[in-house]
Amino acid sequence: MPKKNEAPASFEKALSELEQIVTRLESGDLPLEEALNEFERGVQLARQGQAKLQQAEQRVQILLSDNEDASLTPFTPDNE
């Protein structure tokens, strides 16, 4: 497992670690200090993931801007 302040090697690993943190926090079995540390790490991973998604979106926009026939449609996620 990476050190607490290190970014995971990939978006997928960060997402997996974030899911594990959520599971541990939802269990309610963690002592307060450990729960706070896990929450802090989760926020950090969420921010890193968001940044990676934004970078990917920018790359897609750059690639599509080279193709005049392609148009961008804003993504609207379904409400779950």
Curated annotation (Swiss-Prot):
Enzyme class: hydrolase
Name under which the protein is recorded: Exodeoxyribonuclease 7 small subunit
Entry similarity comment: Belongs to the XseB family.
NCBIfam families for the chain: PRK00977.1-1 (NF002137), PRK00977.1-4 (NF002140), xseB (TIGR01280)
EC code(s) of this entry: 3.1.11.6
Cofactor binding mode and count: Does not require a metal cofactor.
HAMAP family: Exonuc_7_S
Organism name: Escherichia coli (strain K12)
pH dependence, record text: Optimum pH is 7.8 to 7.9.
Disrupted gene: phenotype observed: No longer processes msDNA correctly (when retron Ec78 or Ec83 are expressed in the strain).
Catalytic activity: Exonucleolytic cleavage in either 5'- to 3'- or 3'- to 5'-direction to yield nucleoside 5'-phosphates
Compartments where found: Cytoplasm
Any one annotated GO CC term: cytosol
Lineage of producing organism: Bacteria, Pseudomonadati, Pseudomonadota, Gammaproteobacteria, Enterobacterales
Record keywords: Cytoplasm, Exonuclease, Hydrolase, Nuclease
One GO-annotated biological process of the protein: mismatch repair
Summary of subunit composition and partner proteins: Heterooligomer composed of two different subunits with an approximate ratio of 4:1 for small to large subunit. Also estimated to have a 6:1 ration for small to large subunits.
GO molecular function, one term: exodeoxyribonuclease VII activity
Keyword Nucleotide-binding: no
Function: Bidirectionally degrades single-stranded DNA into large acid-insoluble oligonucleotides, which are then degraded further into small acid-soluble oligonucleotides. It can degrade 3' or 5' ss regions extending from the termini of duplex DNA molecules and displaced ss regions. It can also excise thymine dimers in vitro. Required for production of the mature 5'-end of retron Ec78 or Ec83 msDNA. When in excess of the large subunit, counteracts the large subunit's toxicity.
